[in-house]
UniProtKB/Swiss-Prot annotation:
The keyword Hydrolase applies. This is Esterase FrsA. It comes from Shigella boydii serotype 18 (strain CDC 3083-94 / BS512). SUPFAM superfamilies: alpha/beta-Hydrolases. GO terms for molecular function: carboxylesterase activity. Keywords: Hydrolase, Serine esterase. InterPro entries: AB_hydrolase_fold, FrsA, FrsA-like, FrsA_esterase. Pfam families: FrsA-like.
């Protein structure tokens, strides 16, 4: 079946699909203060989703393309779940968030199929994969159309990997008590085994969102990047996120001695946002297997345990947390009680001495991850490093921060 035919088959209308903003039914807090964050984007009036321009541009999307798709959504006069929110158009049709971003992805998919130059074709496939992921964002459980977009993103990513420099292998890892999970091993040119970074992504992202991290920061240093999806999404969708948040990543770590391209004696973990919760747990529970752990904007304690902090967070992000925990119909009080159990301080880990070197990068006044969380991580480590990243200019400082973090990882691996 051709890629185009697959798109038509997956998105063929069968019934009235639920609209994304209705999937998690919590009590709405009402008006919230505006939020701006380097890693998560910002709240914009009349949008349910946070608009994450920095990360989308960092992944290779042109700012004009983002505005074009947003304009098509805004201009639609189709029925919406909430007339005050542009991105709540019901059904797979013009103006619907998933429809418009997937339509844009198909344009690049067609360019990729028509392009004869393998590397340029690979770039187009990667662009399509990124757009399909934005279509599926924020990846809520039970969002049928989003899950179809994720499937197309994975297919496009596999096509891109066959054409881009280096080698990418799709790996299957067995996890006792449930379904196996799939990861992607990104390898630079040269002879292995290579030092390796295990990527622990955020809850609102897919493992295929981090190719830019590999290409710009790890590959030039001769470091392999291994990704898996977080529990409850993508290739890990059959696994629910639990208080043992690092379960899947632990089983992957334990399997690395059997992966011939990986030097299992030189492995680090890198966690974005809630992925830092996973990475720091690994630092404590699997310290003999890890040379270092790095975190960026970590969600390890305050957001999970502080009600005032939770009140400052956009509805969409709370919906993501509720979705990952399988609490689609829970009250806000029940969600707060459950989130508290995910705090690594409450679990008795953070605050105890950890032998693994840990770095944590943060932005001042980050609504998701205050400086105190990063200080808690680095002060708990026998070899801790605290890294403040200035907010403006956002893109340049984000790049500079990543360069410093990957340089720190390299020193501990190579």
């Amino acid at each position: 079946m051709t890629q185009a035919n697959l798109s038509e088959t997956l998105f063929k209308p069968r019934f009235k699909h639920p609209e994304t903003s209705t999937l998690v039914r919590r009590f709405n807090h009402g008006a919230q203060p505006p939020v701006q964050s380097a890693l998560d984007g910002k709240t914009i009036p009349h949008w349910y989703r946070m608009i994450n321009r920095l990360m989308w541009i960092w992944r290779g999307i042109d700012p004009r393309e983002i505005l074009d798709v947003q304009a098509r959504i805004v201009m639609s006069d189709a029925e919406r779940t909430d007339d005050d929110l542009y991105d709540t158009v019901i059904g797979y049709r013009g103006g619907n968030w998933i429809y418009e971003w997937a339509t844009q992805a198909m344009v690049w998919q067609q360019k990729a199929c028509a392009e004869e130059d393998p590397q340029l074709s690979g770039r187009h496939w990667l662009h399509a994969a990124t757009l399909y992921n934005i279509a599926a964002y924020p990846h809520l459980k039970g969002d049928d159309l989003a899950e179809q977009a994720q499937a197309l993103s994975n297919r496009a990513y596999e096509e891109a990997a066959q054409r881009l420099p280096g080698t990418m292998r799709q790996m299957e890892f067995t996890v006792p008590g449930g379904a196996p999970i799939t990861g992607f091993l990104h390898m630079p040119k040269g002879d292995g085994p290579f030092p390796t970074v295990l990527m622990c992504g955020g809850l609102d992202a897919m493992q295929t969102d981090y190719y830019s991290l590999y290409e710009r920061y790890f590959a030039p240093r001769g470091i392999v990047m291994l990704t898996i999806d977080m529990p409850s999404v993508g290739f890990s969708s059959k696994w629910k996120l639990t208080q043992d948040s690092s379960l899947l990543h632990q089983h992957v770590l334990k399997a690395l001695p059997n992966v011939p391209w990986v030097d299992h004696t030189r492995v680090a973990a890198f966690g974005f946002r809630f992925g830092a919760n996973v990475a720091v747990r690994l630092a404590y529970l699997e310290s003999p297997r890890l040379k270092a752990v790095a975190c960026l904007g970590p969600v390890v304690h305050t957001l999970l345990s502080d009600f005032k902090c939770q009140q400052q967070v956009p509805e969409m992000y709370l919906d993501v947390l509720a979705s990952r925990l399988g609490m689609h119909d829970a009250s806000d009080e029940a969600l707060r009680v459950e989130l508290n159990r995910y705090s690594l301080k409450v679990q008795g880990l953070l605050g105890r001495r950890c032998p693994t070197p840990m770095l944590s990068g943060y932005w001042k006044n980050d609504p998701f991850s205050p400086e105190e969380d990063s200080r808690l991580i680095t002060s708990s480590s026998a070899d801790g490093k605290l890294l403040e990243i200035p907010f403006y200019p956002v893109y340049r400082n984000f790049d500079k921060g990543l360069q410093e973090i990957t340089g720190w990882i390299e020193k501990r691996l190579c």
